Amino acid sequence: MSEELLVSKIENGTVIDHIPAGRALTVLRILGISGKEGLRVALVMNVESKKLGKKDIVKIEGRELTPEEVNIISAVAPTATINIIRNFAVVKKFKVTPPDVIRGRFKCKNPTCVTNAPREPVEPTFYLVRREPPLFICAYCGRYHELGDLL
């Protein structure tokens, strides 16, 4: 394979690299990126990787991910690396790790949990109880959830 760039470099924004093959669209969904926001997003799927065999890459022009967003990506892409780009240069590089607390992003899978009651304005909250593999507990009903199950 030639050493050409499949997608041009971005001036400012975020590059999410080392996403397991086939999971880039799920990463975009987790980040709430649908394509209607006006952001330039480049998506490369199933490219060769020495580390993973095949991988996906997402480039988001004009948006830097928050630390919470970086770590929530670990739900579907535990091998991902996040690069923050400014003026075409990498200024920060992160490995994703499961967050200690997740608030308001996912629903509890327990149908009787108070967070699922339509008349209860309770924000779903989950606490990390195990890092490998990530396991969370609902702050309200005590049900355990693997991070990938919360998606």
Swiss-Prot record:
The coenzyme or cofactor needed here is: Zn(2+)
Q: Which organism is it from?
A: Pyrobaculum aerophilum (strain ATCC 51768 / DSM 7523 / JCM 9630 / CIP 104966 / NBRC 100827 / IM2)
Quote the protein name from its UniProt record.
Aspartate carbamoyltransferase regulatory chain
Which protein family is it in? Belongs to the PyrI family.
One GO term describing the cellular component: aspartate carbamoyltransferase complex
Residues holding Zn(2+): C108, C113, C138, C141
Q: Which InterPro entries match?
A: Asp_carbamoyltransf_reg_N, Asp_carbamoylTrfase_reg, Asp_carbamoyltrfase_reg_C, Asp_carbatrfase_reg_C_sf, Asp_carbatrfase_reg_N_sf
The protein's UniProt keywords, in alphabetical order, are: Metal-binding, Pyrimidine biosynthesis, Zinc
User: Which GO MF terms does the UniProt record name?
Assistant: metal ion binding
What subunit structure does UniProt give? Contains catalytic and regulatory chains.
Read off the Pfam families from this record.
PyrI (PF01948), PyrI_C (PF02748)
Under the heading NCBIfam families, the entry gives: ATCase_reg
Q: Which HAMAP family match?
A: Asp_carb_tr_reg (MF_00002)
This chain's function reads: Involved in allosteric regulation of aspartate carbamoyltransferase.
Question: How, per the record, is the cofactor bound?
Answer: Binds 1 zinc ion per subunit.
- Origin, by domain of life? Archaea
- Any Gene Ontology biological process: 'de novo' pyrimidine nucleobase biosynthetic process
